[in-house]
Amino acid sequence: MRDQIKILITNQKGGVGKSTISANLAGFIAIEKNHKVSLIDFDKQGTSSSLVSKNSHPNIQSYKSGLVYQQNSGITMLEAKAALRRYSAHADITIADLTWTFGLPYEFMHEFDVLIVPSSNSKVEIASTEIFILEYVQQQLMKLRHKKQMILVAPSRVDRNQLKDVKFSGLEILENYSICPPIYRISQINNEVLNDFWFRVDNGIISENMKEFGDFVYEKITELKNRKLALTAELQNRIPVNSTRPNQPVITRSDYLSKEQVKPAPESQTQQEFSFIPPFLRKK
């Protein structure tokens, strides 16, 4: 992949496996898919960067960049953007691990192509995850019009006999939303993370589970990359090569995105509840 892809793995609370998912996804893409990966650990605990350091590989560079949050200050935002720009410069894929706090504006999420939000399958956690994502979408509607960002929910620490309960129905209306294969709750999994990346451990259940998750995310990354390349090619084809006229009209992304809007259909109860979400962000 020549075009850089930036992934943010975030949630508002701990205990859902965010850092271990970040470290293991970085290892999977770097080793299994042979890409240069940069892992940026924005959490003070430095868990994900520590895990990557224990299982070092030449394709992975990890950086610890704990943020100092200052209320009503833009300094944190500037520091976060600067760290992302600096540490992603030479990577094919950048993965940022960040526990979200409202000391950081939602604008920072726009620096990323993919958002991955880990969540347990408890009713409270599912509701919290849905609210977190929908608030972000609602507050950033205009910017999301011009950025085809992918939102993935990663069910984490899920018992295999509860897979049917993993539903995020409040997000199904979003066009670029998908739910990842769940990360299972396995008794030995926390011990294995200290030994090696999950996809390489001897425990077949753990390794196959991580490969399924990693392959799904990588497929979405490839899909997004191809979409960006197609859009770039379309823009280049529409703009006259030999045109040097100063008043030549500028073609914007919205000219193309507007074509994808669907005709309004009779609203269901779910559509009425989320009527604030415009057609260009809704799943067709």
What are these regions (language model features)?
Residues T129-R145:
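Conserved C-terminal guanine-recognition region of P-loop GTPase G domains, centered on the G4
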Residues R157-D202:
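Beta-strand-loop-alpha "switch" segments that mediate conformational coupling across diverse proteins
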Residues P105-K123:
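Inter-motif core of Ras-like GTPase G domains
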